[in-house]
């Protein structure tokens, strides 16, 4: 049995043939070249999408494990869509820079301050904020994401370790919650 091709990432928008379809969050007509992709429908026809890009260089497509839907990442902006449909199911993010695979089929998207988890069925959720400004050395082992969170606070300027459990959705460490709002000793109210 041969697997049917669902998409083809294009070098540029086609210069001939049917007009491409702009895919944006607000349905605006987007004429500049973004991330061009040809999709192959189940009926044998095809269409070309021009995805509005986000803020990074990450351009990739993932076939989701438990659905016919695809995850398209256009320069950091995510689009979940079915190749047979022109309108995306979901659009989110603008600054994703890295994708990691969890052992159970989940995808972990790294942003500057938090993570977004894509479940095998295409649903997604965000972690709480982990860092003030920057995540580094992210890795996944046994559904536990670990790495470093940047702390740019005055006289600190350091990277702090964190761990995030994908199953219990709990964060340990990180830089964002490392400062408590303590009352000065002289205030009694």
List the model feature ranges, each with a label:
Residues 141-189:
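Acidic, small-residue rich beta-repeat scaffolds with periodic aromatic anchors
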Residues 36-53, 75-94, 113-132, 156-177:
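Surface-exposed loop/turn elements that mediate protein-protein interactions on large endomembrane-trafficking
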Residues 23-30, 35-42:
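A structured, charge-rich N-terminal accessory region that forms the first stable segment of a protein
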Residues 58-60, 64-86:
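Long amphipathic alpha-helical segments with strong coiled-coil/leucine-zipper propensity
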Residues 70-72, 109, 143-149:
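A short hydrophobic beta-strand element
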Residues 4-27, 51-67, 91-106, 130-144, ...:
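Repeated scaffold domains used in trafficking and secretory/extracellular systems
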């Amino acid at each position: 049995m041969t697997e049917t091709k669902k998409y083809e990432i294009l070098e540029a928008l086609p210069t001939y043939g049917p007009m491409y379809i702009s895919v944006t969050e607000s349905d605006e007509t987007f004429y500049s070249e973004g991330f061009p992709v040809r999709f192959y429908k189940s009926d044998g026809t095809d269409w070309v999408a021009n995805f509005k890009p986000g803020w990074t260089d990450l351009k990739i497509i993932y076939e989701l494990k438990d659905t016919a839907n695809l995850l398209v990442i256009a320069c950091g902006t995510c689009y979940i869509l079915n190749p047979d449909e022109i309108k995306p199911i979901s659009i989110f993010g603008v600054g994703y820079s890295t994708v990691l695979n969890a052992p159970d089929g989940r995808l972990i998207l790294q942003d500057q301050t938090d993570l977004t988890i894509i479940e095998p069925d295409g649903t997604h959720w965000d972690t709480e904020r982990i860092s003030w400004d920057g995540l580094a050395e992210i890795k996944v082992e046994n559904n536990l994401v670990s790495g470093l969170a940047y702390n740019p606070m005055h006289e600190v300027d350091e990277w702090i370790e964190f761990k995030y459990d994908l199953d219990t959705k709990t964060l340990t460490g990180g830089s964002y919650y490392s400062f408590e709002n303590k009352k000065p000793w002289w205030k009694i109210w």
